[in-house]
Amino acid sequence: MPLVRFKIRNELSLGGPEIQRSASVEDEEPKAILGAVEVAGLIGILRQLGDLAEFSAEVFNGLQEEVTVTASRCQKLTSRVRRIESALSPLEKAVLSQTSHIHFAYTAGSEWHPRIRNGHSHFVQSDLPLCVMESYEQCRDPPPLHLLDRFAVGGPGSCLRKYSDPTFFRKELSNPSKTDDIKVQRDQAHRKRKKKRLPQRNICRSNAVSTSDETNGAHLSSFTDDRPTTSRSTSTVDMPRSSNMQDLSDIVDQSYLQGQSGAQEQSEAQVQSDFQESSKARDSITGSGYIEYVINQSPVDKPEVKLVEGFLSGSLCPADRIGSTVPEGCIEVVDDNILYSPSEDLLVPSASNVCDEKKETLESMVEKSRKDDEPSELHESKFGPVTPDRVRQNQRDFDRTYILFDEVDIVGEKQSKSQANNIDGTLGIENEGEDKSEQESEADEFVDARNTIESESESDIDGVPKPKLEHYFGDISTYCSEDANSDNNDGSEDITYEEMAHDPRHENSEDESCSGSYLPEDSNVSSCLSDPVCEETLFHDENSQKPWEFFTMCPSLLAEKAVPDVTILREEPVMAHPLFAGDSANEKISSEERIISCPSLKDAIPAEKILPEEHLVNYPSLEAIPHEKILPGESIAKYPSFAEIIPQEKILSEKSLEEAVLDNMTPAGEPDAAHPSFPKAVQDKKISPEVLDSKIFSVPKAVSQEPISLEEFVRIHPCLAEAVPDERFLIEEPPSTCLSLTKAMPTEILLPEKTLESSHYLEELPEEDILQEKSVDSTHPSCAKAAAETNLSPEVLDSTKLSVAEAVPQEQVSLEEFVGINPCLVEAVPDERLLPEEPDTTYLSLTKAVAIEKVLSEELLETYPSLAELPEEEFLQEETDDATHTSEAVSDEEISQEVSDSTNLSLEEALPLEHISHEEFVGIDQCLVEVAPEERFLPEEPVITCLSLTMEGVLSEKSPETYPSLSELPEEKILDEEADDAMHPCLSEAVSDEQSSPNVLGSTNSPVAEAVPQAQISVEEFVGIDPCLVEAVPDMRDLPEEHITSCIYLTNVVPIEEVLPEEPFEACASLGKLPKDKISQEESDEATHTLSCAKAESDEHVSLEVLNSTNLSAAEAIPNEQVTLDEFVGIDPCLGEVVLDEEVLPEQLDTTCRSLTKAAPIMTIFPEEPPEVYPSLEELPEEKIAQEEEVDDATHPYFSEAVCDEKIPPLEDPGSTHPSLEESVPYEEASHEELVGTNPFLESAFPNEIGFPDEPGVTYRSSAEAVSKEKNLPEESLPTYPSWAEVVPDEKISREELDSTYPSSAEAVFDENISGSEAPGSTTETGRQNKTFPEKTFATENSLNEAVFDEKIPGSEASTSTTETGPHNKTFPEEPFAMENFLNEAVFDEKIPGSEAPVSTTETGLHNETFTEEPVATDISLNEAVFGEIIPGSEAPGSATETGLHNKTFPEKPFATDLSLKEAVFDEKIPGSEASSSTTETSPHNKTFPRETITTDLSSTEAVFDEKITGSGVPSFTTETGSHNKCFPEEPVPKENILPKEPAAAYLALAEGIPDQKVFLDDAALLLFAEAIFDQKFSPEVPDSTYPSLKEPEMHVAAPCVVTDLPAKNIKVKEGEVHNEPYTASDVSMNQKSGLLEPESTERTFPSSGGTVTISPDTQNSLPNGTSVESISIWSNGGLLGLAPLKPPVFAEPNSGSQHIKHEINEASVLSTRKQESSSRSVENAEKSSLPLIVSDPTSQQQSNMSSLSPMQSTGTSFRVFGLSHRLLMAGFRGNSSSTCKFESVPSSSYDTRVAAIEDRTQQSPGGSSFEEQLDYESSLFGSPTSSPPVEHMKISFNPIEASPVPKLKLRIPCQPRYNGENADMFPSFQLVPEASNSDDGDDNSDTFCQSSPCVSDYCLSDSELWESDESPRISVSSLKQVEERSRHGDMGSFSGSFLDLPCYDAVDHQSTFSRLEQEQVPEYKPSVSEIIRAWPPNQPKSSPCNEANVDANTVSKKTQDQSLGLVATDDEGGDSVCLDEHKTKGI
């Protein structure tokens, strides 16, 4: 039976089946019903056509693709066939030219094809089969090794070559060990003995050849050990494989062409004879069927002999294969090649052979050459065409095969060398430029295994049974020969492949190297060449693989010859050594740089074993041997190893060596000089070598260990360079990297081979020497020891540390640079190794620290100082703190380069001693350590982090010395007064350096601030950088910029700290609070939290003392208590947090500490600074900031605040720092990635591992980035984060605190200036909470953050937040996220009065209690607050509360929340109260609806948008939302469940305000949402009424509840109605989405329902003027065609709600209010917040509304909005309407109107219209008017709302809201909105879709035309009807979509489009339309809920029903009907 591929749905089902079934149809006029049915049928048909068109498009597209593919394949096949045809002719000739083809039976064609030149780039051709190409297309790109080129000495491409060069493996594999050489020698001797016996044996065998051939012929294939192919096939197989054949392919081809026929005959005869002879030979000779075959017997000049022998051995050897297969000429050539190859094969073994054999080999070669000449002569004579002779000759040759085999070893080598030299010389010359590298690579690629086999076969020649031997030779000898060639070529690659090619050939060299007969006279050259070939190959290969073999071999070679040293380096010299040699020993660099280099190595020869090992082990050999041997030797060894490494790296070494080594190398010629010379020359000049060695010991050894320099380079690069040695750098380097920094040792450990060697060498020597001497200090302390040895005072040490710390920071700066550079390296190199990168980065830092220490200690120290200094200077420029410290560090370095260098180096190494080093180290490394030694940092985390800082004893000292030097000084100093200022401010100071003396800063703070900041900064920087590196490294140091932006370390540190600093105050306060609780509960409350804030305010400096002492106690006490932990946690928080998560406070800190994480150290450093900064920020903020929201803005921006802080006193400087933090925070906030990035670096990059950091990270991210990003995380992060905020606020709120605290917060907020006592109250509460909940830190952190952002807000606010937080923390440890969100909110709300943040917090707290996730919402509200910074504090609280509730309701809302945040951003200007209202509303809502969150989020968004609107509006909104949430907890849940996308809708609403509209509702939902938004925008009154009412209640806490309840009831009714209606879920979802909007919706129900009727009850109530709103018909025929109307009609949009406007607005509000109410309040709020233009007025209105709600205003606003909606619709129905609509309506709407409207709206279709409005609003947010989507994207949705009697459908092009500020050209839903066709004129019928289609409205003028003419659309009966309909359906026109004015349907849109006059006329039709609508909805039962709302609720209900139907239809019909319904509802 046929399969149905596509089925078209019934047009009736596609139309509006409910129209036919609707019970309301009975109530409709028959004409209307018929019109509706007609339209429905038409729509169904259109939809069918659309479906068919879509299907056909798919079919044709598929056909086109197939045709294209087929054609492409045909072309490829054709091209392939052509190429094949062109290639076949020579093959055919070759095959046909042979007289006998029997060998084909034994030889695969692929085996003899090798004689044919191989093509290249076979897989690059475009005509390959798809099956082949697919495998390549699926391949990944090669690693971006080229990124490392700049760090490599070799220049561009060197790294890629280095790590992709197959010769490395070939050499490595081909390099036999000394034992192999010995074997080879024995084998040669054995063969010599055999050769003497062979002639006789061969003679004897010759007689039996034919018999044995026949007998054994069958065994030919098996005699080669498991090879099924005959020896011929083997030989042929080998031939193709030999690169020589490829190289010689030209010659071979020529010779082949020349002697093809003769050779074929001969070869045929020979093949037979060979076959027989070989069989006989094998059997008779070995008895086991194997023969020692002759690779090539005759010299190059005797091809005949070769052919004979080749054939004889041909069955046995590849040469013979070729010979047998190929004609004479070819055979000769091939034989020559083979001879060459065998000689090479022998060559390789010879190369393996020690120089001892060279003489023997030379002698034997001479003898063999003589012998070869003889046999070749014999063969030549026998080679004649006579087959019998040839057979006999072959027999004899075969007999002589063994002799020849030996001879071949000698002569063959010689010949092959000469031939190879000639051939290679020729080929090399020919292909030198091109093929050389390629052939080498290819040869290497193909020869690698062969090389190994060759070596084995060579070594096994006598040891292995000859069948196996022959197998190898037959198969391998050629390859070996090839490999020998390749090796020689490759070996000489170092020599240079060119040399082989150019040297006619190192025939001697090859002979020598191959034969192992390095002529004494040639020893220098040949040895160098041969050794390099062998050794270098070995050396190069053995570097890693066979260190000892190579080593033993190399030693013997080296021992045998000094030249081998040269040889050894030859390879290096090629890359590194020239530099090496160049610097070190210009001795023989010349052409034989290798040799010269080798001499350098020769100088290093003592280390030559080491060198090989080093090559092998790189550093370990260096380390082992260097330790074993002289340091110079070692350095030399290492130096060679570098050279080797360099050869390996070839880039790095040269570069590194040049840079690092050059200095060293200049004296490098002298082992000691080379080694010490660099450090000594560099350092010893300053410091005695002993000191240098002792102090810098690791440095001199380390540094002077030029390998270190290389290591540096290699380590720096080794991480890279060595890391470049991918094998190791990943494994070793990463740990090394991290550990290197952590400990030079770890790096060394991690890079045991290389880094470890280098570093370890450094380390080892230092460890052994220094480390053992001072193992603790000496590890890094080796540096430390150097430092200690330097005996710099701790101050100096500190300063040195600073130098060190700075050096580390510098390193990190260098790191940054380096990381910048190195990260590239690291990143470039170890992108693979992300963590390694980080470690690498870290390592680089370390590497730089270490390597730099080493390098820097010698040269780089200066260099590094240069780096450090420059970076310091630069960094100093970047980081004043660091700059200071850096300067100091620089100065320290400057203090004494010796000291600085030695010390700094020492210090850097001493840094480990410095604990700062550890801190830096750990700080730097911490992230690293933490990252790298997660094990450590987790266990030691506090220890390592802080301990790292304090690790050296700092922790034990409680970081007294290091940390205390950091911490202790902070404790002692900082803890006292300065300590806090110095310590925490030490960052502040460090940042500003103003408050604490640079000395203190430098010494104390510097260690602390710098050490910590830098350390931490290093860490953050490092982590930031490193995270940037680690995280950012992959990120390419995105964050470093961020870090840099923040002051990098400050950024990360500060940002967290900022969050934490304040939070530290909060957190620290809470932390400190615990201490401070201990210190003083009251002070804890006031001084502690307030201390941080209020006291910081009042006691700013005093309380800083106290705060410092206390806060230090807190920060430090806690940090020290847990400060160490906290700090630790702070420092370690990432660590400590994880580690200290155990600890409540640390967890708090963790939470806080998360911020503290970086902030903790910073906190420790910064806690003071925050006290300073925070106090400065806080104090100033309270003084200034609270007073100056601007500062808050600045604060919020933190850039600004930093700027403002700049305005702020020196504390400001910390403030600046703090602002940097804050700035970072704003980054964090503003940049989610920055939050995520900054914190994430720490968190994610650094402590993602840490649960809490993740949590903060997630939360933090989720707050900022995660929220938007983690729309997944939002729940997680948001929930967590929310839980933070949620818990905290919840506790506040839920503890009556919400009301009391919230008001308190609000009061506090509003009472920003409230005295500290109030703050203490808050603080006390906070203290209590803190007491109650150590975790509260999270909340505190939020509070802190909030405080931070709200710093300007009085401390009490922060306290409130804290208090709130406390409970929250109590409830939810993770709440800090929420709090953090809240913080962010506060941050953004910083400008908002302090109370706002608390309110938000309180609300959040409440919510958080209920919903942990809420924090996301909070975060959003935070963000919202952030964006809504301008909004009064209450607003933020409102937002927070709302968000809290919302979050509570919807964890996932975070997206929405995030959106709301963004919205809030847009709505920053909105008064705080508004946010508060939103918040309040949200709380209930959240309680009620977890999912409501979206709505809440929307409401937050709305609140955000509404924030701009007067605060009262928002509160009303919020309250309403709360009520709504309360009313429909399940709905939100079902809605959310039902509408994850509905949240999307909400999200869209948010997104609308925010670009983040990632969730798209179905067309219906989207349209409804957009329409709701649009309507809402158009009828701001509703938001205003609702908003003011809510806001007013918000201001009056009870009121929101009342309002909330009322809206809730309305919503219930509305939703009930709507919900009951078919589209209930969607509607509810819409409502839920609307959430807060629903109350609006309730008001708007009228718009959504029956515009006038609904408006009549509600609006009439709401609109005292009783002005009726005319429906606006919007024509967008052009829109349908994708044309944008040229000009929107101009509507007056009074910003202030004048009475007239108010009346108008009231009228419009009736519609728009209903719509808006129908649309989510969030939309409304969003609109408000999105009404920045009108915001001032709306805000005033809001405020006035708050104080007094005037329906007039709301009406006026609605009317204005309505006008705006008309404008917007006219303007483009998307951008314009959105932008126009979003403001005005909300501000003006009064609460009363709003309430009534809300009821109606809610009853009607709050969800739909709110959704629509939101979408509309979204559009308006983004706003530029945009034309309707192109026709191809247009979807004509028709969902008759309640079977409206209107026969006309208006094509409604919903405004495409610009998602994310972009016009998302999704498939806009075009809805044919049925409009009641009550009109009598026939235009309705004539105006059917057809008329509209031509883009002509029933007015005959397109909208654009009308707009151009500035005419308002003509009113037509249909338009009036539409207006009525619109009144009934809701103000469709307000929908921000373009409506295609299909005259039949014009009523709906035309109402929107109509001028106000028409709007006024609307009421005439409205009642009838309403009635029609009432009758219309078939889902009357669902409108029963609407009936619940019956007042005019019936109308509303019907409207709602319509919407519901639409919604339901949307659900049923894919959202199309919903859109219509929505549009109707909204339009109505």
UniProtKB/Swiss-Prot annotation:
One of its GO terms (cellular component) is cytoskeleton. Residues 171-188, 366-382, 1922-1931 have a biased composition (Basic and acidic residues). Residues 1473-1483 have a biased composition (Low complexity). Expressed in expanding cotyledons, expanding leaves and expanding siliques containing developing embryos. Detected in unopened flower buds. Reduced expression in mature leaves. InterPro entries: SCAR/WAVE_fam. GO terms for biological process: actin cytoskeleton organization. Residues 189-199 have a biased composition (Basic residues). Residues 203-219, 258-276, 1513-1524, 1644-1663, 1710-1723, 1737-1754, 1981-2004 have a biased composition (Polar residues). Residues 171-244, 258-283, 366-390, 416-443, 877-903, 1469-1491, 1511-1536, 1639-1663, 1710-1754, 1911-1931, 1977-2028 are annotated as: Disordered. Interacts with ABI1 and ABI2. Contains the N-terminal Scar homology domain (SHD), but unlike the genuine SCAR proteins, lacks the C-terminal VCA (verprolin homology/cofilin homology/acidic) domain. Belongs to the SCAR/WAVE family. This is Scar-like domain-containing protein WAVE 5.
